[in-house]
Every structure is written in C-alpha cells, then in structure tokens.
C-alpha cells in the first residue's frame, strides 16, 4: 500500500499568516512609525520606548484587527493561488517546478494578493500610525471594519485602493522572496540528504526566504507606506519616489533593520505554522 502524503488546504496560508501576525505585530507597527518619519530622528528602540511611554504597552498592538484582516485577504489569496497551482502542475509533471516557474507563479500570486489586500492594508497602516499623531489629528478607527467603512464613506471607494499598484508590486516581490525562495531552499536542503522534512528544515528554509523577501521589497515597502499614509500630497508613485529620494538614498531603506527583524520571524513562523497545519490537517494524497 502506498504511503500517504498531505498537501495544504487553500486557506491554510491565511490561517498561518494570522498566527504569525499576532506574534510580530509590534515589530510591524514600529516599522511603520520609522518609515513615516520625515527625518531620521528615532531608531527602533527609541521609537518603541516613545510609543509605550506615550500610550502604554497595548499601543504596540494598535491596529491588530486590521493586520489580521489584511492577512485573511492578502496572504490567503497569494498562498491559495500559489499552492493550488504549484501542487496541480507538479502533480502532472511528476516533479517539483523549476525555480523560474516558481518565481513566475509567485509574482502572479503576489500581484493578485496585493490588489485584494489593499483596502485592509490601507487601514492597517493608518491604525498603526494613529498612535503617534496628536489627539486632534487621529482617525480613531474602532477596528478594521470600521476603518474600511469610514474610508469608503468619507473618502470614496477609490480611496480604498490608493496605492494598489505599489501594494501589488510589493506583493509580487515579497511572494517571490517568501514562497518561491522557501520552496527552492527547502528543496535544496532536503536534496543534501543531511536533513529530513522536519521543523528544523522548515526553520532553515523559511529563514533564508525571509532574508530574500526583506532584501527585495524594502524600497517598495517604504514608498507604499508613505503613499497609504499620505493625505493627498503625493501625485503618484513616481512623485513619492522623487520626494523620498530628496531625503537621501538611504531613505528608501529607512526601517530596514526592524523590517528584517519583523519579516524574517514572520516568515519563519508562517511556514512553521503552515507546515504543521499541512502535516496534521492537510488533504491526504497518494505519494
């Protein structure tokens, strides 16, 4: 009798990403604060101390509902497309996809996920940035759904997709860095014969993937955050890039350290959770 393997269900990526987001949300919030500074005034530790001192420890979880909403749109979409297509194509070809096909599939999945997740991403950035604004300038969204409703009512439906081009481009890059590079790294690690398909292998492969994703998407991440948090002062992506460049070339990598500190653990946790979901609750298929 043939041994049985398991493949992920289409929604496992969204669930795993939500679990990871709950663990890394404070780092994501600090990253947004650092990126939206007009001048480099505070580093990561200083920003964390200021947030806690001003609004309390729970302020580090400001916007968590929007972050979870984003994961259940953006991450669920890209994981569902990538894993469903990859598993079906690989099943027909009797072997893993070549790396260039993984990159292409990751790009398409990320573009779709980035577009679908733009409204939740917009609200997520605003809710995280709210705690550093003066009381009179805060938007004070009660939760993610309230934020989505108020943006649509007060600013129009088009505003919900402000920065969609940038979010989709960033989604493509981070998905290539995470999903495509994770698959390839895991394949290479297993091919050495020194490690089996266990949690340590998942950790090593996802750590590599997190580093790749951070390197690829940081410049776009800075521009996306500035566009979404703007009040109309930028005419588009190019104008935002020009204005950011005036602050110096390193402005595109503002918040790089907290971005890496946040994205690498987030990537590791996402894939560890995903692999455990697949192993214990995945769909059984003949191996």
Curated annotation (Swiss-Prot):
Recorded catalytic activity of this chain's protein: (S)-malate(in) + phosphate(out) = (S)-malate(out) + phosphate(in); malonate(out) + (S)-malate(in) = malonate(in) + (S)-malate(out); (S)-malate(in) + succinate(out) = (S)-malate(out) + succinate(in); (S)-malate(in) + sulfate(out) = (S)-malate(out) + sulfate(in)
A Gene Ontology cellular-component term: nucleoplasm
GO biological process: dicarboxylic acid transport; gluconeogenesis; glyceraldehyde-3-phosphate biosynthetic process; lipid transport; malate transmembrane transport; monoatomic ion transport; oxaloacetate transport; phosphate ion transmembrane transport
UniProt record similarity statement: Belongs to the mitochondrial carrier (TC 2.A.29) family.
SUPFAM superfamilies reported in the protein's UniProt record: Mitochondrial carrier (SSF103506)
InterPro entries the record matches: Mit_carrier, Mito_Metabolite_Transporter, Mitochondrial_sb/sol_carrier, Mt_carrier_dom_sf
Name by which UniProt lists this protein: Mitochondrial dicarboxylate carrier
Membrane-topology descriptor: Multi-pass membrane protein
Transmembrane helix is among the record's keywords: yes
Keyword terms: Antiport, Disease variant, Lipid transport, Membrane, Mitochondrion, Mitochondrion inner membrane, Primary mitochondrial disease, Repeat, Transmembrane, Transmembrane helix, Transport
Tissue specificity annotation: Present in high amounts in liver and kidney, and at lower levels in all the other tissues analyzed.
Entry's localization field: Mitochondrion inner membrane
The protein's role, per its UniProt record: Catalyzes the electroneutral exchange or flux of physiologically important metabolites such as dicarboxylates (malonate, malate, succinate), inorganic sulfur-containing anions, and phosphate, across mitochondrial inner membrane. Plays an important role in gluconeogenesis, fatty acid metabolism, urea synthesis, and sulfur metabolism, particularly in liver, by supplying the substrates for the different metabolic processes. Regulates fatty acid release from adipocytes, and contributes to systemic insulin sensitivity.
PANTHER family, A to Z: MITOCHONDRIAL DICARBOXYLATE CARRIER-RELATED
GO molecular function: antiporter activity; dicarboxylic acid transmembrane transporter activity; malate transmembrane transporter activity; oxaloacetate transmembrane transporter activity; succinate transmembrane transporter activity; sulfate transmembrane transporter activity; thiosulfate transmembrane transporter activity
